[in-house]
Amino acid sequence: MYSGTDNRLDMTFDTFKKIVDDTGSEIFELQLEGGEPLIFPKIYLFIEYAIATGRCAKVIVLTNGIELEKNLRRLVQIHQWYGTEFHIKVSVNYHLLKVHDNHLKTLADLVFATELLPKFNIELNTRKRHNDQWIDAEIDAFGLSEINHSFELQSYGRMTGSNYDGVKIVQNIDSWEIYAVDGKCFGIDLVARSEYEKKLAEEANNEHD
């Protein structure tokens, strides 16, 4: 989704339910992303509804990790209750490490706390500026290199027009789709969805002014 700080839009449960129900009898994986999904009030309603269909093979949460410590116990409880596989993908970048002291130490502690849960996985997705190799070195110092996927920033959204490469899509399934906050499907076009949601956010903000 568009993750600007001016975004006041949340997906409704009815919209989410329709997306899930429209998958019919198919087995699916649910990926929740932001903004920041761990501050979304209905995140657990969404997760448990998807799992309750009996067709959700995996829950994936994309987070900056700041609220993960507060939410970890509940996420693990849902995982253990239903037996559904969970993947928590934590974004790491220069800004997060400079603003939040001990961020990597906290993440290392959370990884250690869940290491005996083979189907509850925490991974790092590191986005680097040019010359940010020091981030990989810090991640290695905390023993997190094995779960780290390191990339340079991508030229879309706020970074459109920058001297970085375009979008690189990494997925472990062949058939997947992304949805905007209002339920509109964009296939696999991350850029189009980002621009669409940016426009929705601007329109919503204009209505509040």
Question: PLM ranges: what are they?
Answer:
Residues 6, 33-34:
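Short, contiguous strand/loop micro-motifs
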Residues 121, 135-150:
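Eukaryotic C-terminal
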Residues 9, 39, 178:
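Aromatic-acidic/polar surface patches that form glycan- and anion
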